[in-house]
């Protein structure tokens, strides 16, 4: 099957549906979706095949995690199904071929326990060579997801698929949903917004009446979004 057939395959969409509702079955909206899931799955399949798919509405909230406040944008179940079918069946299998084995983030079957095992292995190897003479460097990229440039992320992903037309179309659609309304910016601020550091948490304090859709910034992805997790482990800049 080609990439379009893989993403649109009813069995793959069904698997994506099961993953998408797994942690939210207690929600009323999820329960309503589950009552008619077959009809919705085939509607999604039809929209994908006819290129009529549109991004659904989102909900914003904040997550307090390890002493940090993270701005989260939640998407509808329909959109989650599309993301999972695309990422789980097409993007991640290809991305895995191009990342180091010790990268355990967002990779099924690895995770924190696997990362701990690999960390211990590296510690033992280092001790055998150098004993206690050494140190560990711990780093973090501040506002990493907030400042991912769409053009670069999309270009690098498309390289893995020889600029496939279907992958190009669906990535373009999803990235359009990531765009940030920066109508509140002056012309001078807008001219440098792609290189200036963006802070989504501060952005949420901007009055809604200033966000009128006149200026859009093609930078930043949503934390927790399935595609964002793939981009996070492969984004080269």
What annotation goes with each model-predicted range?
Residues 39-68:
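Active-site-flanking structural segment that lines cofactor/substrate pockets
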Residues 20-31, 62-73, 100-102:
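Glycine-/proline-rich flexible loop or hinge segments
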Residues 129-237:
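Conserved polymerase palm-domain catalytic core
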Residues 69-100, 214-237:
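Conserved pre-motif C helix in the palm subdomain of viral-like polymerases
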Residues 7-24, 55-60, 87-95, 127, ...:
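Short, compositionally biased low-complexity segments
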Residues 1-47:
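Non-catalytic, polymerase-adjacent accessory regions of viral genome-replication enzymes
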Residues 3, 89-150:
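Active-site-proximal segment of RNA-dependent polymerases
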């Amino acid at each position: 099957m080609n990439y379009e057939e893989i993403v649109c395959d009813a069995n793959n969409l069904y698997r994506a549906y099961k993953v998408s509702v797994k942690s939210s079955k207690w929600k009323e909206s999820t329960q309503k979706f589950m009552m008619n899931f077959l009809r919705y799955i085939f509607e999604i399949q039809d929209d994908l095949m006819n290129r009529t798919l549109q991004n659904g509405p989102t909900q914003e909230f904040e997550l307090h995690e390890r002493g940090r406040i993270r701005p989260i944008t939640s998407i509808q179940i329909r959109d989650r199904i599309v993301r999972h079918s695309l990422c789980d069946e097409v993007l991640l299998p290809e991305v895995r071929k191009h990342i180091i084995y010790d990268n355990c983030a967002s990779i099924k079957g690895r995770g924190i326990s696997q990362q701990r095992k690999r960390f211990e292995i590296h510690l033992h190897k280092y001790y055998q060579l150098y004993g206690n003479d050494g140190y560990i460097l711990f780093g973090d990229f501040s506002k990493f997801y907030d400042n991912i440039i769409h053009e670069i992320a999309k270009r690098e992903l498309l390289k893995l698929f020889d600029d496939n037309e279907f992958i190009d179309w669906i990535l373009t659609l999803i990235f359009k949903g990531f765009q940030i309304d920066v109508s509140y910016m002056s012309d001078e601020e807008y001219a440098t917004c792609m290189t200036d550091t963006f802070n989504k948490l501060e952005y949420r304090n901007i009055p809604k009446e200033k966000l009128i859709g006149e200026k859009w910034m093609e930078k930043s992805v949503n934390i927790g979004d399935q595609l964002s997790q793939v981009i996070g482990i492969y984004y080269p800049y």
